[in-house]
Amino acid sequence: MPAEPLPQEPGAAALHPLKGRGAARIPAPMDSLNARQIAALPYVRGWLFAVALLIFCMVIVGGATRLTDSGLSITEWQPLLGAMPPLTEAHWLEAFEKYRRIPEYQLVNKGMSLGDFKFIYWWEWTHRFLGRFIGLAFFLPFAYFAATGSLNRKMLLRCTVLFALGGLQGALGWYMVSSGLVDRVDVSQYRLSAHLTLAAVIFGAILWVAYGLERNRRMPSSGADGMALLLALLVVLQVAAGGFVAGLDAGMGYNTWPLMDGELVPRGLLAIEPWWRNLFENALTAQFDHRLLAYVILVAAAGFAYAAQTRAALILLLTVLLQASLGIWTLLWQVPLWLGLLHQGGALLVLAAALWNLHMVLNLLPKQLTGKCQSPTRSPARYRR
């Protein structure tokens, strides 16, 4: 039986990066879905995007909790009973008394009023409440879709993994908070970075599932595929690096750009022994690494956008430029609350754009990946969209 011919390539106008509907796509895997599952796709996609939006909001609230030094105001982890905030004056005094026992109060906030305590308490409570709400917002629709047969086996497995990651994130959040309740006045930068990075991973994983509901994506097999994947991984790595900057309060120092206090490569990058600890415990090194990785991502995104000539690559480049600008602005202004939150939210937007770019690349037919991204020795023909 003769092989099925590949789809015809569209005309030049349709292949223009900013015109037309773009290149031919790999057919949607409708053969793996029944009629009920096909009909449910818009609702499943909307649900996943809604959960991703909630996670975005939670990351912003988490950033505000950190920047207002509110994260240690609730000294217990009660997944069920802790859902209710203090409702009476006696309950508030009881919560305040627990806070006054920890080092942060005794060494930093000695003499804090009950009103000031309520301010930081509400930030932390809101952050935890959002976590519980997101758990319900994910689980209840998931249970409904599963019970009605609206998800195939692959989606059931993926959603189960996502739900498990959400539970792990809650436990990791408490593990982070617990590090600041004894013998120190802040949380471990290692645990903070892990908590932030896992939030980004869950956010990205949900978007990745939502992006690919209807289409078979190829496995990465070319230079273009690998570069798009590398960009997405670099963004996740940058989020982790940003977590160390936040955990070490590294953004509060060296508030100059493009130099760091007059030096391109500042002295003191390896002040701690052994050298590798500087990556995670030296505020100067953490900020330098965060800057350097930002430059790498910017150059890589610009090169990819030039070679690819696609909408997705252009959007990625623009989000990277915006995020880099926000980062510089935040640094120069010594991390005001609103700018710090914009920069933290911008990181997730860059991740969303990087994953969309990767998704679009893996939806192109292999025969279209013959551009500069695939091999510098070939002709400069480019893949589109």
Residue ranges of model-derived segments:
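Polytopic transmembrane helical bundles with strong interfacial aromatic enrichment
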Residues: P27-R385
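Short, low-complexity intrinsically disordered segments enriched in small and basic residues
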Residues: M1-R25
